[in-house]
Amino acid sequence: MKRILTMLLALAMIFSVAACGKKSNDGANDKPVDVLTKVWETYKDDEKFAAGGGDANNMTMDGPGKYDVSDVEGLDAQLGFPQASVALIEDAASLVHMMNANTFTAGAYYVSDANEVELLVEDMKDNIMNRQWICGFPDTLIIVGLGDNTVVSAFGNAEIIDTFKTKLLSVYDGAKVLCEESLN
């Protein structure tokens, strides 16, 4: 009897260890600032550029920062997030090129209702594509979905956006490019 019990316990341990072995990372449980931070941390020193993030109250000078979703005008002016869609998100973060935001700007957003993601993507795309650019023109816009409720947008220099997209897709299993458009 002891032998059977020992064997059953050993099998249970083996299966529990195997179940913990590979965990999917689809971004479903990551906060927006964590999403951008995980991607930023994959950049090698020669790939990095002067970048900061966050809003005026959560500003960082060396990487992504939390963005207060109650700053409706700031979300629109700095990240291209449509003011009319702010009610759809609970949390946000940003990563922006410090010399020129049109060279690279990324925002990550947690969408309250997964059923609203498709509508939000269209609103974001329209808002960014219809902007009047003042200081240089970004080349490319991407919007990527992570899990059911997280959306990441980025616009800027085509090469920098391509690097960001590649890194984002490699960090998050199942991430999907929902929009990729030329802004020229």
Regions of interest found by a model, annotated:
Residues 15-19:
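C-terminal motif of bacterial Sec signal peptides marking the signal peptidase cleavage site
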Residues 21-105, 111-184:
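Soluble, non-membrane globular domain cores that form compact, hydrophobic packing
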